[in-house]
Amino acid sequence: MIRTNFFLKQARRHEVKAKSSKKHRSDDTVDRDHSDKIRDRLNSSENGDEKHRRKEKRSSRGKSYSRSRSRERRHRSRSHDRRKSRSRSREKKRRPRSRSRSRSKHRHRSKSRSKSREKKKRIEKPRRHSRSRSQTPPSPPAFRGRNAAMDAQEALARRLERAKKLQEQREKESAEKQQEIAAVAAAGGGSVINVAALLASGTQVTPQIAMAAQMAALQAKALAQTGISVPSYYNPAAVNPMKFAEQEKKRKMLWQGKKEGDKSQSAEIWEKLNFGNKDQNVKFRKLMGIKHEEEAGTSSVDAESFKTLKQQEEMFRNMDAQYEMARSQTHTQRGMGLGFTSSMRGMDAV
C-alpha cells in the first residue's frame, strides 16, 4: 500500500510537471509568434528591395530560433531531471511543426502584404507619370480645321509666284521695246533723231534704250561704208560692226579663187630665178610649187628685176665655190692634222 501510494504521488507530480512544461512551451511559442509578427511589421514598413529583405528575414528567423533553442536547452539541462529530457525530445518533435506553421502563416501574410504593396505601387506609377507630364510643356493640340502657320506659308508661296510672273512680263515687255528701238534705229539715220522720236512718243528713255540706239546707229554706218551688216543672231551691244566688216573682207579674200592675170612682182622674180645650173633650177621650182618652166627673155623683165636676178646668180656662184673649197679641205686633207692649222690658213687666204 505504501508503495502504491508513493507511485501514485509520483505519477501525479509527473503529470503536474508535464502540464506546467506544456503550458511553458505554449507560452514560448506564442511569444515567438508575437515577436515574429512585430519583426515582420517593422521590416514591411521599410522601403527598398523586398526580395532581398525576405531572404534576410528567413536567415534571421533561423538564427533566432536556434539561439532560443540553445538557451532553453542550457536552462533545462541545469534545472530539470531526465524526465524533463524526455519532454525535450517531445518538444523537438513538436517544434518543427509549430515552426513550419508559423512560417507558413508569416509567409502567407508577407506574400499578401507584398502583393498589396505591388498593387499600390502599380497604382501609384501612373500618377507619378501624370505628374511628370504636367511638369513638361503640354503637347500641341491636334490639327483641326485650318492652321495659321500653314495658311501663312501658302499665302507667301502665292505672293512669290505672282511676283515671278510680273517680273517675267516686265522682262518680255522690255525685250520687245528694245527690239522695236533697234528696228527704228536701223531704219532711221541717227541715234539722236530716234531718241527724240521716242521722247515725243511718250516712252521713257532708259540708259539701255540709249545704248541700243547708239549701237544701231553704228551698224547703219558700217553697212553704208562696207556693205556688210551684222547678222541678227549676234548681240549688237557685244559686237563692233566695223571690226566685224573688216574680218568678213579678209575671209572673202582668203577663200576666193586666184585669177591667172594677177601676178605680183615678187612671184615673177622667184619664177625666173636662175642658180646657174639647170638641175638646181628644176629642183627649186618643184619645191616652190612653180608649175610652168618658161624661160622668159630679158625684154619681158624690167631693168630692176634683171639686176636682182644677176645679183642672185653671182651670190649662188660664190656660195658654190666656197662650199667646194670647204669640202676639199675638211674631207680630203685629213693628214694635215685636225684641219685647224694649214687648212684654216688656206681658208683665210681664199
From Swiss-Prot:
Biased composition (Basic residues): 10-24, 52-132
Iron as UniProt keyword: no
Composition-biased stretches (Basic and acidic residues): 25-51
UniProt feature coiled coil, ranges: 146-187
A UniProt-annotated Pfam family: SMAP
Protein keywords: Coiled coil
Keyword presence, Membrane: no
Ranges where the record places region Disordered: 1-146, 328-350
Family in the record: Belongs to the RSRC2 family.
UniProt name for this protein: Arginine/serine-rich coiled-coil protein 2
Biological source species: Xenopus laevis
